[in-house]
């Protein structure tokens, strides 16, 4: 995973391979960064647009991926690409370079706070941005866990379940 922030836009690219041996190779990382630079230069809106975008030599990202696959002898693929736009953007890539997150904020926040929030989003793997976007079965599952936890609290021992569900 590689990321880049340019002004009010953040870009994230995940180039997948089969082994850690290839993934930890500096040349492989350089290739991922080169593809990310193509994304930034062309301001690619989505994965399909990025795959069709060309570098300065006239090669598409799709061709770059195929070439890298031939060089390494492994199946290489552009597993994920995202671009966001917000007044303030932050990015985090986990130390193993296998996980990363880009976030947009509607106002500027201290860099340390942005870093911490982005790191936590990466670690927690959220399923949605808000409860409204969350699948109903996930909300119900989490609600059941919360009610069970409240039942275990001695302070709630005498409260009816109907009341616990409203807390």
Residue ranges and their predicted role:
Residues 1-167:
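N-terminal assembly/interaction segments in proteins that build large macromolecular machines
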